[in-house]
């Protein structure tokens, strides 16, 4: 007799056969009633890798034992500590090692990148973003426009969703780039839209923007560690991201930045700081700034070593699993959840995120029948029974099954609780 592919027993079989199942044990889970919480919020804050504590302690021990000499001696010299995460980051984002650097935080890095790559002229001064962009991105873009004496009402172009569910077609994006092309100085686009969970064809967006003569940058906050990326091959000028979501580097973690290799030795204007000075002569303390080649030339201050340690722990797990295997499991998990919702609770939940796996990562954005009031009621009920998603105004519950630590049986637990709530 064939097993029902949407049964609990089939989910258990999928979990037992999962080649990545051991990775779950590498993370610390919050507890609820003496059990591991069912955690679907890796898109907001990833779980703590168990090895993070040891790596942070290693830095603390080195600080205690060596004090300032820890910059130049010890098991992991702080002078080059940021380079310990460089190769792993490059593999995750599809870049050359010298194109990436871990530094600052996302919005700080976005300002640094716009200082270099947003070069408005009389004819070409507009910035194109998606309508409903993450507020910090929009604040950064508006403030950059004002710094140049430009009015956001005139020079900020927002591409409105062309679907009732709030998503954007590639046709709409292409049409906007074509329509405004001669005015565009910069196209700034997300890898994944934070509210809808929609993933975009980044290579195509980069090609279209550059064909119009615009610089192109990506905010990869919800894409890095979630979907395969190929930043070098896509030809994007720059990208920025955070590490506290899918890369599990902890609250307020150090951010990440990509600068394409074609800019590695350029004389682009930049906001400079001493740690961006070339390493061989940095400690001569000379007044002339000589940038390090590649993305490291945009560094400002010495790296936050304690904050880099958890990222190092997480990247070891990504290297152990590999992005292709993580993506394959992610598509299975999210597809399984989609089937469960359509089959068992279609009258309760509407999926906002596109059904095409190429247009989403692991996150499904959900609206609850009955609107915001019912949505909040379900969200709070799920919290009360130890199932944690997150809420985004005005009416979206986001559920993100993360392949590093979520299981197929977690999806059944979620849907069973939705059924219980709906039947009450």
Curated annotation (Swiss-Prot):
Belongs to the kynureninase family. Keywords: Hydrolase, Pyridine nucleotide biosynthesis, Pyridoxal phosphate. Its cofactor is pyridoxal 5'-phosphate. It holds the Pfam family KYNU_C. The gene is kynU. The keyword Hydrolase applies. Catalyzes the cleavage of L-kynurenine (L-Kyn) and L-3-hydroxykynurenine (L-3OHKyn) into anthranilic acid (AA) and 3-hydroxyanthranilic acid (3-OHAA), respectively. The modification N6-(pyridoxal phosphate)lysine is found at residue 245. GO terms for molecular function: kynureninase activity; pyridoxal phosphate binding. InterPro entries: Kynureninase (IPR010111), PyrdxlP-dep_Trfase (IPR015424), PyrdxlP-dep_Trfase_major (IPR015421), PyrdxlP-dep_Trfase_small (IPR015422). Its EC number is 3.7.1.3. GO terms for cellular component: cytoplasm. It catalyses: L-kynurenine + H2O = anthranilate + L-alanine + H(+); 3-hydroxy-L-kynurenine + H2O = 3-hydroxyanthranilate + L-alanine + H(+). Disulfide bonds: none annotated. Homodimer. This is Kynureninase. Pathway: Amino-acid degradation; L-kynurenine degradation; L-alanine and anthranilate from L-kynurenine: step 1/1; Cofactor biosynthesis; NAD(+) biosynthesis; quinolinate from L-kynurenine: step 2/3.
């Amino acid at each position: 007799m064939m097993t029902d592919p949407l049964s609990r027993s089939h989910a258990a079989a999928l979990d037992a056969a999962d080649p990545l199942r051991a990775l779950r044990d590498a993370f610390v889970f919050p507890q609820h009633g003496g059990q591991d919480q069912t955690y679907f919020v890796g898109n907001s804050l990833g779980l703590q890798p168990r090895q993070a504590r040891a790596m942070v302690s290693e830095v603390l021990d080195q600080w205690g034992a060596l004090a300032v000499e820890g910059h130049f001696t010890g098991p992991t010299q702080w002078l080059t500590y940021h380079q310990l995460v460089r190769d792993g980051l490059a593999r995750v984002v599809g870049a050359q090692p010298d194109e990436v650097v871990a530094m600052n935080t996302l919005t700080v890095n976005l300002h640094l990148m716009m200082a270099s790559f947003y070069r408005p002229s009389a004819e070409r001064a507009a910035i194109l973003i998606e309508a409903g962009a993450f507020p910090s991105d929009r604040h950064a873009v508006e403030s950059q426009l004002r710094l140049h004496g430009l009015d956001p009402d005139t020079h900020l172009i927002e591409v409105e969703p062309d679907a009732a569910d709030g998503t954007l077609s590639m046709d709409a994006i292409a049409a906007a780039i074509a329509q405004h092309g001669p005015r565009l100085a910069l196209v700034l686009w997300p890898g994944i839209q934070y509210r809808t969970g929609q993933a975009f064809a980044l290579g195509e967006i980069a090609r279209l923007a550059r064909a119009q003569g615009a610089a192109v940058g990506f905010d990869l906050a919800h894409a890095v560690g979630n979907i395969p990326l190929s930043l070098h091959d896509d030809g994007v000028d720059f990208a920025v991201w955070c590490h506290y979501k899918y890369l599990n580097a902890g609250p307020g973690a150090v951010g990440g930045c990509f600068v394409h290799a074609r800019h590695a030795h350029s004389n682009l204007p930049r906001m400079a700081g001493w740690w961006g000075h070339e390493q061989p002569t940095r400690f001569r303390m000379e007044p002339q700034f000589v940038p390090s080649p590649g993305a490291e030339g945009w560094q400002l201050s010495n790296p936050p070593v304690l904050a880099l340690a958890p990222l190092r722990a997480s990247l070891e797990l990504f290297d152990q699993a590999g992005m292709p295997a993580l993506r394959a499991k992610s598509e299975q998990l999210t597809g399984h959840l989609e089937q469960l919702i359509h089959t068992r609770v279609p009258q309760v939940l509407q999926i906002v995120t596109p059904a095409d796996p190429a247009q989403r990562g692991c996150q499904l954005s959900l609206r609850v029948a009955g609107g915001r009031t019912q949505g909040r009621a379900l969200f709070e009920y799920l919290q009360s029974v130890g199932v944690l998603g997150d809420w985004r105004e005005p009416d979206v519950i986001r559920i993100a099954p993360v392949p590093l630590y979520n299981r197929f049986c977690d999806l059944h637990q979620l849907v069973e609780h939705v059924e219980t709530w709906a039947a009450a």
